[in-house]
């Protein structure tokens, strides 16, 4: 059984009120008394009851972040950004991993564990637009991502279509004409893959280049292995291309590996760009050109909006914010000499 405040008071030989004063860092506690209480807390491995604390103050000082998969680098780096943004406001972050499973995504909004936090930052992957009416919980919610629009919750998202268009235009500006896509999802319209493919198509249309589905590789997941398998498929089919747009960085990394193994020079023979600006893309060989979708801004905006909603739950109608983006040219498109100096479009 977990230790209680009364247990701590008994072991320390002080009153319940004194233990409470120590835990809440009240100034008027003698050093010797504080030391006795802290020793008792350590001996009993006492953990504060966030639910009880919330009943007293109305707030727990914690927020929940629900993500599909921390094994995907983008979500791991997003979690880090949210934790950093929350810490600036004295908040702790509780992590829920849904596994991109519809049942678990629904459960996270109804979980008793939400009573341990003041709000939920939620990035669904299995739920879709048809589930917009199901986005509700007993605490304020801020949605992330591109699966659901128009719910009753605040929403922070990236500019997928303009950013993908800018990434494709970067390749076109370098003289590339046959740009393969790695990472499309069959039949998807709303969602990161569908929106980024739309941006790619818009860039081609703007330059009068016909869309060719024969150089679009469809996948189920967005891991390096999927990017590698998709590139193997393109090469095995004899597809002709001089550039690749990986719809995320891990897909692009898998594609680059297969291209190099097949004897292609990157970017000499095939230029490659990804999307997400993962930290590791600065250290790949070659370094990977990519799109920075504004991950830190997403995290900071989500925390700010959640705090505003916690303070005034019905203060304003649901808000939707799109973060800025920028194309980051590196060696995989412009070569080592030009990397870092090439102009980059920015979404405002």
Feature-to-residue mapping (PLM):
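N-terminal helix-turn-helix DNA-binding module of bacterial transcription factors
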Residues: 1-61, 337-348
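Amphipathic helical "hinge" segments at domain boundaries
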Residues: 35, 46-111, 115-119, 186, ...
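Hinge/beta->alpha junction and helix N-cap segments in small-molecule ligand-binding domains
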Residues: 68-77, 95-104, 156-166, 182-230, ...
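Periplasmic-binding protein-like
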Residues: 116-124, 180-183, 217, 238-248, ...
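Flexible loop/hinge segments that line or gate small-molecule binding clefts
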Residues: 123-166, 186, 209-210, 250, ...
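Flexible loop/turn connectors
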Residues: 232, 236-243, 248-348
């Amino acid at each position: 059984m977990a230790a209680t405040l009364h247990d701590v008071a008994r072991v320390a030989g002080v009153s319940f009120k004194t233990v409470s004063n120590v835990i809440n860092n009240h100034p008027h506690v003698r050093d010797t008394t504080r030391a006795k209480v802290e020793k008792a807390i350590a001996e009993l491995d006492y953990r504060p009851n966030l639910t009880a604390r919330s009943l007293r103050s109305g707030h727990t000082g914690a927020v929940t972040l629900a993500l599909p998969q921390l094994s995907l680098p983008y979500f791991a780096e997003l979690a880090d950004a949210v934790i950093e943004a929350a810490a600036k406001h004295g908040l702790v972050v509780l992590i829920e991993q849904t596994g991109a499973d519809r049942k678990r995504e629904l459960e996270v909004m109804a979980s008793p564990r939400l009573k341990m936090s003041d709000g939920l930052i939620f990035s669904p992957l299995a739920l879709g637009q048809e589930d917009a009416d199901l986005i509700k919980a007993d605490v304020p919610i801020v949605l992330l991502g591109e699966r659901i629009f128009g719910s009753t919750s605040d929403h922070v998202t990236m500019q997928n279509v303009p950013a993908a268009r800018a990434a494709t235009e970067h390749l076109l500006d370098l003289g590339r004409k046959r740009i393969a896509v790695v990472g499309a999802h069959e039949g998807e319209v709303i969602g990161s893959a569908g929106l980024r493919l739309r941006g790619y198509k818009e860039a081609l249309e703007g330059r009068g280049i016909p869309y060719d589905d024969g150089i679009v590789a469809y996948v189920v997941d967005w891991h390096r292995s999927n990017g590698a398998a998709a590139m193997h498929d393109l090469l095995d089919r004899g597809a002709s291309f001089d550039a690749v747009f990986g719809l995320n960085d891990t897909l692009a990394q898998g594609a680059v590996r297969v291209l190099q193994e097949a004897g292609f020079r990157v970017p000499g023979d095939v230029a490659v760009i990804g999307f997400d600006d993962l930290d590791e893309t600065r250290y790949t060989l070659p370094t990977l050109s990519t799109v920075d979708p504004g991950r830190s801004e997403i995290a900071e905006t989500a925390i700010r909006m959640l705090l505003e909603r916690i303070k005034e739950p019905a203060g304003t109608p649901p808000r939707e914010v799109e973060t800025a983006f920028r194309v980051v040219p590196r060696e995989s498109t412009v070569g080592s000499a030009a990397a870092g100096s090439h102009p980059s479009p920015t979404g405002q």
